[in-house]
Amino acid sequence: MRAADTLQASLREVVGEANVLTDPDATAGFLVDWTGAYRGEADAVARPRTTDEVSAVVRICSGAGARICVQGGNTGLVGGSVPPARRDPERPTILLSASRMTDIDEVDVIGRCVGAQAGATVAAIDARAAQAGLAFPIDLASRESATAGGVVSTNAGGTRMIRRGNTRSQVLGIEAVLADGRGLRRWTSLIKDNVGYDLPGLLAGSEGTLAVVTRVLFRLVVPPASAVVAVAAVDHVQTAIDLIGAASSQGLTVEAAELMTEAGIALVHEHGQRRPTASRAPFYVLLEVSGPGDIEAATAELLSGTDGLADAVLEPAPARALWGARESHTESIARSSATPVVKLDISVPIRALPEAFAELAGVGDSGDFDCRPVLFGHVGDGNIHVNLLDVPVERAGDVTDTVFGIVSAHGGSISAEHGIGRAKARWTHLGRSDVDLDAMRAIKSALDPHWLLNPGVIFG
């Protein structure tokens, strides 16, 4: 009997016959990311239901020397949620899916927190919080499919980061399974708990390379009593930055700040999304603000005093139609490229944002690359999502080199919130020194000495 067959039989004893998938038709959806750019191979897909089952699955795989790839909602954009492209003939590969781990606890209203299994979606967690009059501080365009385990593993930022911080800031406690199958539980609603290392913080952003996250205790927040959403058509990136600063100076709380371009708005309009403003401009800034008193009047006054503004529209939150212009970018971009979109998630210091944005938008004009750049992102924290359409497949690495060169020249990061995954593993040296990388490898080796968890992710 093949080693993979023996392994599959052992896994079936833990999670049941129906939850160990080996038929190619059944496993196909787990082995390709949603963009279609990354495809992998696995000897089986295991779907545990509880932390104990995850522990048993990992213990079996560890004993067999099998590689374990962890997957939540499979909405990642850097290839970290699918297995390596080729099987290792010496070691089986198991994809561990959290798709059955969707439980969400009752909300602790006094402690303002809620526990959720790794497969619970962002939207479901927020809905549970809303039942208690609270809100989940993480919000993403992929909220209906992105999962608790996924946002923790990538330390996702999202549209509310300017107000609430990244995912790591929202994690109070965590349950995880180490590479040898032992369970790690750091579960407390204490705001102050300074005993030793911050292991939940370490696992946030580790992309499944240090442990398998199974449950998370998230912080919840009180939603603003009143908020409005404005989309302003502006002449320059600096105008958008100044608008955010002016909002804060006038006593408004900036809940979200998103930047779009005319190229992006035209693209989403082609795919059925209405234009947010009647007038066109090079840039569009979406601003969601809250505050006391007549928030609409205060926001209207803010906009009226902005130089370089061609047009603006204002609606009470949640203003889904206005948000739709921003949130439909990713899907519209994916449907508009003749080749897999080169998707890069970068950040630069806000002071460098106007110049860096112009250089990145000009990548397709240099003559070196025949591509269409579409840029958008979180202007309030310097995060730009660079999307390069119609790049010849053989030039994807070259154009990525160019983009990352621009980012490095401005003192930026090659990964703002999507993680490194497989897509950026060859470029990690641009963001970390040799000593830094050695320290990261030492941590990896300490927690996963045989390097079984998510092979190829972060370190290549």
Positions of PLM-derived features:
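Noncatalytic alpha-helical scaffold of FAD-dependent oxidoreductases
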Residues: 1-460
